[in-house]
Design a protein with these regions (language model features):
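Conserved beta-strand positions in the central sheet of alpha/beta enzyme cores
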Residues: 3-4, 157
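Conserved aromatic-histidine-acidic binding/catalytic patches
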Residues: 4, 8, 133
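Active-site beta-loop-alpha junctions enriched in small/polar residues
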Residues: 7-8, 38-43, 161-163
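Active-site-adjacent beta->alpha loops and helix N-cap segments on the catalytic face
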Residues: 7-25, 164-169
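An alpha-helical appendage that flanks or caps ligand/catalytic pockets
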Residues: 18-147
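Hydrophobic anchor at the start of a short beta-strand
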Residues: 35, 155-156
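C-terminal/domain-terminus segments
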Residues: 146, 158-169
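Structural motif
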Residues: 151-153
Length: 169
C-alpha cells in the first residue's frame, strides 16, 4: 500500500494509479493495494471563505508542510513547484535564502505539520489550502470523498494543526 499526499480529485487519483501500474508486476492489483491520503479535513460553514482565519488555524499546518516539501524538492532535485504556490514562491524562497545554507534544512520544516510560524502565515493562500486540504461543506466533502473512493482511494488520514486538533477531531 501507500500513504500519499491528498489527491485533489478523482482524476488525480487515476493519475496516481497510472503511475503505480506503469512498471508494476503482472500480479499487481488495485484491489490488494491499500491507499491512504494524508490531509487536513475541515467542514466549512455556509458562506465561509476557504482562507478564513478558522480554516487557516485548523488546517494551515498541513498546507504549510506541503510548501516545505515543495521547497525541498526544488532545492534538492530541481523539481518545479506546484501551481498552487506560484503566487508566493518568489517571496517564500527569498525568506528561506536569508538563512545560512548549513542550517536551512532545520528552518524549512519549522512548525512542520503542527503549527504555522508567524512569518509563514502570509503564504497560506486560498490556492494552497484548496490544493492540499479537504475543505468544504458537509455535502461537498461527502461528494468528494465518494468520488475519490470510486477512483480507488481507500482511506483519508486527517491531520489537523496541533493546537485545535481535539476540537477538529
Amino acid at each position: 500500500g501507500a500513504v500519499m499526499a491528498f489527491p485533489g480529485s478523482a482524476a488525480m487519483m487515476e493519475n496516481i494509479w497510472a503511475m503505480l501500474e506503469k512498471d508494476a508486476p503482472a500480479e499487481f492489483s488495485r484491489d490488494s493495494f491499500y491507499t491512504t491520503a494524508l490531509t487536513a479535513m475541515i467542514v466549512k460553514e455556509e458562506g465561509e471563505a476557504i482562507d478564513s482565519p478558522r480554516i487557516k488555524h485548523e488546517c494551515g499546518a498541513m498546507a504549510m508542510a506541503s510548501l516545505h516539501y515543495a521547497y525541498d524538492q526544488w532545492r534538492n532535485f530541481g523539481y518545479q513547484p506546484p501551481n498552487a504556490v506560484a503566487s508566493v514562491w518568489e517571496d517564500y524562497t527569498k525568506l528561506l535564502s536569508a538563512f545560512p545554507e548549513e542550517r536551512r534544512h532545520q528552518r524549512i520544516h519549522l512548525g512542520h505539520n503542527c503549527w504555522v510560524i508567524p512569518e509563514e502565515q502570509q503564504f497560506l493562500t486560498k490556492e494552497l489550502l484548496q490544493a492540499t486540504c479537504l475543505i468544504g461543506t458537509q455535502e461537498e466533502l461527502i461528494e468528494k470523498l465518494r468520488a475519490l473512493n470510486e477512483a480507488g482511494l481507500n482511506q483519508v488520514m486527517n491531520l489537523p494543526s496541533f493546537d485545535p486538533r481535539f476540537d477538529v477531531l
